[in-house]
Amino acid sequence: DLSYPIDYREEQEAEKVKLQLHATNVVTNGLQLEHEKACADLVQNPNNFANENKIILSGSSCFNWSKSDPQGVIDDAKDAVSQKIAQDPNTMVIGQSAWKLLKKHPQLKGLISDNQNKLVTLNLLKEIFEIENIVIGKSIFSDKDGNFVRIWQDNIILAYVPNLGNSRTEYDPSFAYTVRKKDALNIDEYTKEGNKVKYIRATDIYTPFLVGAEAGYLISGVNDPSYDSAKDKGDVNE
């Protein structure tokens, strides 16, 4: 559950409908963020993947280094998935810190023709990696200490997810599902503090499951914390 308080004096001074709409948006967006966080924690945990479906980059293989090979790493990841399920990954989630490195990487920039902007865009990345759905994980949440942190870390997740359509069945291979109770999403209100404060509450019941880890691949450690630009020719971090 997530709740948003509205003081009765605040409600009297504001336009009631707009204030309640704002409160509803806040709590529903909060639930969506909680869902994304639960999914991100699940798919960024190396323990949920077989050895053949994950890699932890280190040293000069990290994408800070100009001589690293992101295209080769992605190709190997795609091969690992296709060997397990006979399907290539069609979805990729890139953490924000990993995206900052990829879009400036010399190898990928070298694939852009001279008459184009020398910055790798998301559409170009889809062409280079031959993956139709690429999403940059930019969401931020507040941890238990009140610090704002990224939900998606310096990781890249590849997955095969069946496209929605009439031909899709429950037997199709898929990386993960969220099981949600029917009609579980509910918005209601209640009062506290002697009826002086009204709360708009959103409730949802769901559980994400990593049902087909063999249909996914986790690339961790994209960012080398010991990177030294003085030792690198062609600094990716410029």
Where are each of the predicted segments found?
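Long, hydrophobic/aromatic-enriched structural stretches that serve as scaffold segments
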Residues: D1-A38
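Helix N-cap / beta->alpha transition motif
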Residues: P5-R9, I94-Q96, G212
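Short acidic/polar capping segments at secondary-structure boundaries
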Residues: T28, Q32, Q44-N45, S97-W99
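Intrinsically disordered or highly flexible coil/loop and linker segments, enriched in small
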Residues: E36-A40, Q87, I134
